[in-house]
C-alpha cells in the first residue's frame, strides 16, 4: 500500500517534444544556425542571372556613370547662380545700364590719366558685372594712393574716391631720392633737380624713423628751420646737417633730445653756426662739445646739391 502511494506521488514521466507535437498537432521549428563569416548566402533561383560575369561588369560601369553624372550635376548646381547673375547683368547692360562715365574724387598730386586707364577697362561693361574690388586692388598698387573706394552711380557712372598719402620727407639711399610719407612708405621717385621743399633724411632705415626725428626737432624749435637734412647712423642715432654747412652728431636714444637742447642754448649764447666749423660732436652725453674747423670757408649748399655733398653721404 505504501509502495503504491509513493508511486502515485512521483513526478509524471517526461515526454519527448517530438512525440508531444505529434499528439497535439503542433509544428516544431528548428533554431536558426548563425551564418559563419566565411559562408556565402545563396541567391534565390530567380535572381541567379545576376551572378553572370557580364552583368557584374555592366553594373560596375553603370555605377561609375552615376557617380560622374552626380558630380557634373553638383558642378552645375554650384554655377547656376553665377550664370544667372551674368545673364541678368548682360540684360541690364542692353537696357542702358553700362559704364559710360568715370568720376574721380580726392586726387591732388597723382596723374589722373593713370586712374582713368584702370577704370576704362570696364568701359561699356554692364554695371552689375563691374568688379569693383579688382579696380580697387589695382589702384592700391600706386605709391600715392593710401586707400581707394570704387562704387556705382546708376545708371552709367563709376565713382573712384581716392585718399592720397601726404609726403613728409625725401629719403636718400644709395644715391636715389624717393618721396615718403610719415610712415616711411615710398610714394614716388624724386628728380634731384626738382626736389620738393621737404626734410631730407639719409641712410638705411632713415625713412622708418621720421616720427622720432620730428619729436627730436620739436625739442629745439629755434634750430629746426636751420636744419637741412638728417642722417640715420648705424640704425641707432642721428647726425643733423645745417643749411650753413655744419654737422651735429647726437648721442643715441633719449640722450639725443637733451643734447640738442643743450646745443641750442650754447648756439644762442655763442653763435656757433656760420663761424667756419664743420662738425660738432656730442655723441658722449655730458662731455664737452668737440668742434672741427674747416680749412676753407664754408659754402652754403643749395637744395639739389645737398644730396651729393660729401658731408651728407648715405654711405654709412
From Swiss-Prot:
GO terms, biological process: cell septum assembly; FtsZ-dependent cytokinesis
Periplasmic side: 81-316
Region ranges (Disordered): 1-34, 295-316
Bilayer disposition of the protein: Single-pass type II membrane protein
Cytoplasmic face residues: 1-61
Predominant place of localization: membrane
Superkingdom, taxonomy of origin: Bacteria
Regions crossing the membrane: 62-80
Keywords: Cell cycle, Cell division, Cell inner membrane, Cell membrane, Membrane, Transmembrane, Transmembrane helix
Subcellular location: Cell inner membrane
Keyword Ribonucleoprotein (UniProt): no
Domain POTRA positions: 97-165
Listed GO CC annotations: cell division site; plasma membrane
HAMAP family on file: FtsQ_subfam
Family label: Belongs to the FtsQ/DivIB family. FtsQ subfamily.
Function: Essential cell division protein.
Protein name: Cell division protein FtsQ
Organism: Zymomonas mobilis subsp. mobilis (strain ATCC 31821 / ZM4 / CP4)
Amino acid at each position: 500500500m505504501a509502495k503504491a502511494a509513493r508511486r502515485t506521488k512521483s513526478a509524471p514521466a517526461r515526454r519527448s517534444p517530438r512525440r508531444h507535437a505529434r499528439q497535439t498537432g503542433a509544428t516544431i521549428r528548428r533554431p536558426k544556425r548563425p551564418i559563419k563569416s566565411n559562408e556565402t548566402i545563396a541567391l534565390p533561383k530567380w535572381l541567379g542571372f545576376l551572378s553572370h560575369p557580364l552583368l557584374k561588369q555592366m553594373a560596375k560601369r553603370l555605377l561609375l556613370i552615376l557617380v560622374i553624372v552626380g558630380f557634373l550635376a553638383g558642378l552645375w548646381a554650384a554655377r547656376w547662380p553665377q550664370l544667372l547673375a551674368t545673364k541678368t547683368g548682360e540684360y541690364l547692360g542692353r537696357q542702358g545700364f553700362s559704364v559710360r562715365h568715370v568720376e574721380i574724387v580726392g586726387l591732388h598730386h597723382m596723374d589722373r590719366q593713370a586712374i582713368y586707364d584702370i577704370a576704362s577697362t570696364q568701359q561699356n561693361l554692364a554695371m552689375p558685372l563691374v568688379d569693383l574690388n579688382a579696380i580697387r586692388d589695382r589702384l592700391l598698387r600706386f605709391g600715392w594712393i593710401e586707400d581707394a573706394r570704387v562704387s556705382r552711380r546708376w545708371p552709367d557712372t563709376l565713382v573712384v574716391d581716392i585718399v592720397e598719402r601726404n609726403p613728409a620727407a625725401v629719403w636718400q639711399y644709395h644715391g636715389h631720392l624717393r618721396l615718403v610719407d610719415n610712415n616711411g612708405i615710398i610714394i614716388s621717385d624724386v628728380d634731384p633737380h626738382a626736389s620738393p621743399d621737404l626734410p631730407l633724411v639719409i641712410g638705411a632705415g632713415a625713412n622708418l624713423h621720421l616720427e622720432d626725428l620730428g619729436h627730436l626737432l620739436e625739442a629745439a624749435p629755434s634750430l629746426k628751420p636751420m636744419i637741412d637734412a638728417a642722417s640715420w647712423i648705424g640704425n641707432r642715432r642721428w647726425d643733423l646737417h645745417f643749411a650753413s654747412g655744419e654737422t651735429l652728431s647726437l648721442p643715441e636714444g633719449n640722450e639725443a633730445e637733451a643734447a640738442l637742447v643743450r646745443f641750442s642754448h650754447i648756439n644762442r649764447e655763442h653763435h656757433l653756426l656760420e663761424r667756419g666749423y664743420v662738425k660738432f660732436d656730442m655723441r658722449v652725453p655730458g662731455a664737452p662739445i668737440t668742434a672741427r674747423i674747416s680749412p676753407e670757408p664754408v659754402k652754403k649748399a643749395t637744395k639739389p646739391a645737398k644730396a651729393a655733398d660729401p658731408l651728407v653721404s648715405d654711405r654709412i
